[in-house]
């Protein structure tokens, strides 16, 4: 999961088997977070875009974009955490977006060269979108 800020990220941790990774963490804490994820001590990584690039996280099957990525490049790197070689299942990427962000979603589709399928509208504020 990706959030725009460390404050949003920390506010959204819900279970014991969730860990977080963001730029405000000192490097030893980041290393411990990744070690816990790789060892299976935690199931879910809630992260800011600090985790979008350069991390080898095998076995990731689902990426949830809780906030719109700032660019198509960021989207591609976030989504690239799922469906990597060696994954048992194809990767799925969920993008949570408000209805008033439809133009932003369309722009993301064009720039990232992806088709985003609208699945369901939830209330007045959120939309779940699947890509992949």
Feature map (PLM): residue ranges:
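Conserved helicase RecA-like core
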Residues: 1-132
């Amino acid at each position: 999961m990706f959030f725009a800020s460390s404050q949003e990220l920390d506010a959204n941790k819900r279970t014991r088997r969730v860990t977080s990774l963001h730029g405000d963490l000192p490097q030893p804490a980041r290393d411990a977070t990744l070690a816990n994820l790789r060892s299976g001590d935690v199931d879910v990584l809630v992260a800011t875009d600090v985790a979008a690039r350069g991390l080898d996280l095998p076995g990731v099957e689902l990426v949830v974009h809780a906030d719109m990525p700032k660019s198509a490049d960021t989207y591609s790197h976030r989504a690239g955490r799922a469906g990597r070689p060696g994954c048992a299942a194809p990767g799925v990427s969920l993008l949570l977006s408000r209805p008033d962000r439809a133009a932003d979603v369309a722009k993301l589709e064009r720039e990232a060269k992806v088709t985003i399928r609208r699945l369901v509208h939830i209330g007045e504020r959120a939309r779940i979108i699947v890509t992949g």
